């Protein structure tokens, strides 16, 4: 079992912190007008990483919420992983130079696998691949289009590339609080040796307990968004559960 990390999500749209329903920009729920303050709050609550997505950037193909991301980076000292609109090496270099700990490449991973491999070679441990699936196929361009590539096929492409993590999102479950798609996420984790992070649908503390069960030992963590903002998950309870699981693992119980 790898160390499990619970990532609070900050999705940026027009400089504000929002949550979408199944990736639909027309169904954006605004949770905060101050993403930096939200980031600082998550850090104070004890989270060890932040997951940030530039939603406008994902659709535009280039960064669109740079000011908000800069403010987040200035507000916290915990590591930040960032996705959305990262399709060129200069964008990767720019974000890493600004202090982003890990960048997430999504659309470009499907369209230009060589770009991902080169980025992982240049920046070892700092490149993740976002695998966003709709009906088993990988979606691209802010989930507006669906490719013919399956999640497992895409993951295997980067098996020996030095990618730090694969972030698997079930689009049908994203933002609707129906629970993580554990079977599909585990299928991906079993197909590759790269750490896999689950996303999309985490709804309750029971979902946190689920990823800590022995059969989910291959999972490196999960991303939580709406459940955290809605108060369905108590951060202290969730983080305490993870600590207990790690202590039990270390003691061999």
Swiss-Prot record:
<keyword id="KW-0028">Amino-acid biosynthesis</keyword>
<dbReference type="GO" id="GO:0000105">
    <property type="term" value="P:L-histidine biosynthetic process"/>
</dbReference>
<keyword id="KW-0413">Isomerase</keyword>
<comment type="similarity">
    <text>Belongs to the HisA/HisF family.</text>
</comment>
<feature type="active site" description="Proton acceptor">
    <location>
        <position position="11"/>
    </location>
</feature>
<dbReference type="GO" id="GO:0003949">
    <property type="term" value="F:1-(5-phosphoribosyl)-5-[(5-phosphoribosylamino)methylideneamino]imidazole-4-carboxamide isomerase activity"/>
</dbReference>
<dbReference type="InterPro" id="IPR013785">
    <property type="entry name" value="Aldolase_TIM"/>
</dbReference>
<dbReference type="InterPro" id="IPR006063">
    <property type="entry name" value="HisA_bact_arch"/>
</dbReference>
<dbReference type="InterPro" id="IPR006062">
    <property type="entry name" value="His_biosynth"/>
</dbReference>
<dbReference type="GO" id="GO:0005737">
    <property type="term" value="C:cytoplasm"/>
</dbReference>
<dbReference type="Pfam" id="PF00977">
    <property type="entry name" value="His_biosynth"/>
</dbReference>
<keyword id="KW-0368">Histidine biosynthesis</keyword>
<dbReference type="GO" id="GO:0000162">
    <property type="term" value="P:L-tryptophan biosynthetic process"/>
</dbReference>
<keyword id="KW-0963">Cytoplasm</keyword>
<comment type="pathway">
    <text>Amino-acid biosynthesis; L-histidine biosynthesis; L-histidine from 5-phospho-alpha-D-ribose 1-diphosphate: step 4/9.</text>
</comment>
<dbReference type="InterPro" id="IPR023016">
    <property type="entry name" value="Isoase_HisA-like_bact"/>
</dbReference>
<feature type="active site" description="Proton donor">
    <location>
        <position position="132"/>
    </location>
</feature>
<dbReference type="InterPro" id="IPR044524">
    <property type="entry name" value="Isoase_HisA-like"/>
</dbReference>
<dbReference type="InterPro" id="IPR011060">
    <property type="entry name" value="RibuloseP-bd_barrel"/>
</dbReference>
<protein>
    <recommendedName>
        <fullName>1-(5-phosphoribosyl)-5-[(5-phosphoribosylamino)methylideneamino] imidazole-4-carboxamide isomerase</fullName>
        <ecNumber>5.3.1.16</ecNumber>
    </recommendedName>
</protein>
């Amino acid at each position: 079992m790898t160390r499990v990390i619970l990532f609070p999500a900050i999705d940026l749209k027009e400089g504000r912190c929002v949550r979408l329903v199944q990736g639909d920009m027309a169904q954006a729920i605004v949770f905060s007008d101050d993403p930096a303050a939200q980031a600082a709050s998550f850090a104070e609550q004890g989270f060890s990483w932040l997951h940030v997505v530039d939603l406008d950037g994902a659709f535009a193909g280039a960064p669109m919420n740079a000011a908000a991301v800069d403010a987040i980076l200035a507000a916290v000292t915990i590591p930040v992983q960032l996705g959305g609109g990262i399709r060129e090496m200069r964008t990767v270099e720019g974000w890493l130079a600004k202090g982003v700990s890990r960048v997430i490449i999504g659309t470009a991973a499907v369209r230009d696998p060589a770009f991902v491999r080169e980025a992982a070679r240049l920046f070892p441990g700092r490149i993740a691949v976002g695998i966003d699936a709709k009906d088993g196929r990988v979606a691209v361009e802010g989930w507006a289009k669906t490719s013919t590539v399956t999640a497992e096929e895409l993951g295997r492409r980067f098996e020996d590339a030095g990618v730090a993590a694969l972030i698997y999102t079930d689009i049908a479950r994203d933002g609707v609080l129906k629970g993580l798609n554990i079977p599909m996420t585990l299928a991906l984790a079993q197909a590759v040796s790269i750490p896999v992070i689950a996303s999309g649908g985490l709804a309750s503390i029971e979902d946190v307990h689920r990823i800590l069960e022995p059969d989910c030992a291959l999972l490196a963590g999960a991303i939580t968004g709406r459940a955290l903002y809605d108060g369905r998950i108590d951060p202290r309870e969730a983080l305490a559960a993870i600590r207990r699981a790690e202590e039990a693992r270390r003691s061999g119980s």
